[in-house]
Structure formats: C-alpha cells, structure tokens
C-alpha cells in the first residue's frame, strides 16, 4: 500500500519512485518516511527506471562512487538490482507486475526483480540469476526466492500475441493461462 505519505492526486500518498511525474520534494519526503521506518536506516536507496525488460544492474563500488548524473544514467532501463553492499536498500516498483526478491545465503547477495509479462517471457529471473552466478558465484540451490503479490489470473486478460510469446518461449500454457470465452482472451 501507499498510505501515510506526502504525494497528492494520482501519486497519493507514499510514492517513492522519482520517475512518475510526482513532485520531487514529495518523493524525497516519502523516501525519508520509508527509510526512517526501517529497523536499520539504509545508507543508500536505489530505485531504477524500469522498462519491462530484462536488464539487471549490480550495485557495487562502481555505482556507489559514481556521480549523481552517472548513477541516474546507470539506472535507466533496469528491471533488476543485485547487491551485497551493506546498508544498500535496492528497490523496485510494481503495480500489476510481480516483485521477486532473491537471497543467496552462501554469498550474502540479494536481488530485487521487477517481473512483468515482458520480462517474464524473456526470462528476467534467469538473466538475474546468471548475473549473480557470474559476479558472485551464486548457485541456485543456495537461493531463497520470495514472490510478492501481483495481478491475479482472473483480473489480467491478454490477447493472442501475449499467449503466443509465452508459448513460443517454451512456457507450459496449460499451467499459466486460461481461455475466457466471454471476452475471447486469455
């Protein structure tokens, strides 16, 4: 939920995403509210500009020592963040899309993944795990995944183009889709 913040109108009230068109000062104050409510105050709050793609960014010394302008550029088109930097709070924004958190318990690496249908059909989770493996030696058996809430099957309808994109990429359609005769959609 987004209650208890400073934003007005469409962004009411606890919007923390700076890429929405909300007032910058309201976003800053909302971020302050969130950070001050956490058990341990983060040193960094990292929020990417998501594009429903599959790109993952590792938040490490390169990012942390970059200028504000460089950081802004690095966060463009990113739908997953990975880090093992202490005090670094990685964030994603979702509405209908699915938030997924990953934790590599052996290497103390975390990831936050924004999984919309476009990212899912193009294996964003696999790309994120591959990047964790390449960078930190993450093994799947050591990863704990937490899948957050998103839109339900009954509320999310798609046309043939989305169905076909998943089918062509090898997804088991009997398990993830349902034909709705009344609307002629899945």
Which residue stretches match the model-derived regions?
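Active-site microenvironment for binding and transforming phosphate-containing groups
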Residues: 1-186
